[in-house]
């Protein structure tokens, strides 16, 4: 559909997914077919990864060669291994502890067949391996998500007119400082412009601020309460916190 309307470049944001299939489902949507050692066609799901013996591109449309795909992600995790997609993010997607190692091994086996070079590429593990799939099956290129968005917004020019930059995060933790959006914005902000973070909560593993050009971080939650109550009070808590910060800056 996009090609029919003349689109030549596509940005694909990858991250925060509920999938961990190495991008095999996406590849099937593009026309790729996967077969086992007996030449039986496999379902394009994560549980098939370790059984793939042959990949067919006969039904893949040729127009894919004429489209530039940029894969936007702000994680640097490789596809497999201790820092890979499955070991780091598999638990939060519902994988049982005893399955992590076998799923990781099956994903590695699949890409040893499909594209061995992807196993060493930073960011390939984003989206449960979706980034690896887009590189391998759609000739995509992994780029910094936050930097690409800031470039599209002409951030570097606009920020020069700012007196203060405020970034946000649902829960700021050590992982947030590894290159997620708030830090990406802070790094692109001139040193003379202060950057403050307003967050839902702050994790115990956060190092002291200033850090990564963020001068201070403020949680909006003011009391211990049930999640439903906390969510219902989000607007009120955010406004109160922002007002208090404004009053402090006005001293």
Please identify what each model-predicted range represents.
Residues 1-14, 18-251:
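N-terminal loops that bind phosphate or other acidic moieties
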């Amino acid at each position: 559909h996009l090609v029919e309307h003349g689109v030549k470049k596509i940005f694909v944001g990858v991250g925060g997914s509920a999938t961990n299939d190495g991008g095999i489902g996406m590849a099937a949507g593009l026309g790729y077919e996967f077969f086992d050692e007996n030449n039986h066609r496999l379902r394009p799901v994560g549980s098939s990864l370790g059984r793939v013996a042959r990949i067919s591109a006969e039904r893949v449309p040729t127009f894919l060669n004429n489209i530039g795909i940029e894969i936007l992600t702000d994680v640097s995790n490789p596809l497999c291994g201790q820092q890979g997609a499955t070991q780091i993010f598999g638990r939060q997607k519902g994988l049982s502890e005893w399955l992590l190692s076998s799923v990781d091994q099956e994903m590695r086996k699949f890409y040893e067949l499909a594209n061995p070079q992807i196993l060493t590429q930073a960011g390939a593990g984003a989206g449960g391996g979706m980034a690896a799939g887009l590189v391998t099956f759609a000739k995509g290129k992994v780029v910094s998500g936050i930097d690409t968005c800031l470039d599209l917004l002409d951030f570097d020019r606009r920020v020069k007119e700012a007196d203060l930059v405020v970034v946000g995060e649902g829960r700021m933790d050590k992982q947030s400082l590894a290159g997620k959006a708030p830090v990406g914005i802070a790094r692109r902000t001139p040193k003379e412009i202060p950057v403050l973070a307003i967050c839902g909560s702050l994790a115990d593993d956060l190092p002291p601020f200033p850090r990564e050009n963020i001068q201070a971080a403020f949680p909006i939650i003011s009391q211990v309460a049930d999640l439903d109550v906390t969510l219902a009070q989000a607007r009120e808590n955010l406004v109160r916190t922002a007002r208090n910060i404004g009053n402090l800056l006005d001293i």
